[in-house]
Amino acid sequence: MPAIEIGRICVKTRGREAGKKCVIVDIIDSNFVLVTGPKEINGVKRRRVNILHIEPTDKKVEINKGATDQEVKQAIEQSGLTDFIKEAVKPKIPVI
């Protein structure tokens, strides 16, 4: 199971959206991915994120590369993970 893959649900660990869950929509390069909440579900905007600032979970939704927010929302609802996405978690702060 690759940790960083399209459709993987992750927890943001840094920034103003820390603790919220998001879905990987596209892999930009070896350091950045495109994620979305989508915003209507939990308030996470579609944006580029450093892979060091997200923590993958064991859950995944089936979406295509570059899926729109509506497609992601439908995939989450079909998977029955809406409540899982909405609940915030306390992110693990890495020790530096």
Swiss-Prot record:
<dbReference type="InterPro" id="IPR014722">
    <property type="entry name" value="Rib_uL2_dom2"/>
</dbReference>
<dbReference type="GO" id="GO:0042273">
    <property type="term" value="P:ribosomal large subunit biogenesis"/>
</dbReference>
<dbReference type="GO" id="GO:0003723">
    <property type="term" value="F:RNA binding"/>
</dbReference>
<keyword id="KW-0687">Ribonucleoprotein</keyword>
<dbReference type="InterPro" id="IPR039660">
    <property type="entry name" value="Ribosomal_eL14"/>
</dbReference>
<dbReference type="InterPro" id="IPR008991">
    <property type="entry name" value="Translation_prot_SH3-like_sf"/>
</dbReference>
<dbReference type="InterPro" id="IPR023651">
    <property type="entry name" value="Ribosomal_eL14_arc"/>
</dbReference>
<dbReference type="GO" id="GO:0003735">
    <property type="term" value="F:structural constituent of ribosome"/>
</dbReference>
<dbReference type="GO" id="GO:0022625">
    <property type="term" value="C:cytosolic large ribosomal subunit"/>
</dbReference>
<dbReference type="Pfam" id="PF00467">
    <property type="entry name" value="KOW"/>
</dbReference>
<dbReference type="InterPro" id="IPR005824">
    <property type="entry name" value="KOW"/>
</dbReference>
<protein>
    <recommendedName>
        <fullName>Large ribosomal subunit protein eL14</fullName>
    </recommendedName>
</protein>
<comment type="similarity">
    <text>Belongs to the eukaryotic ribosomal protein eL14 family.</text>
</comment>
<dbReference type="GO" id="GO:0006412">
    <property type="term" value="P:translation"/>
</dbReference>
<keyword id="KW-0689">Ribosomal protein</keyword>
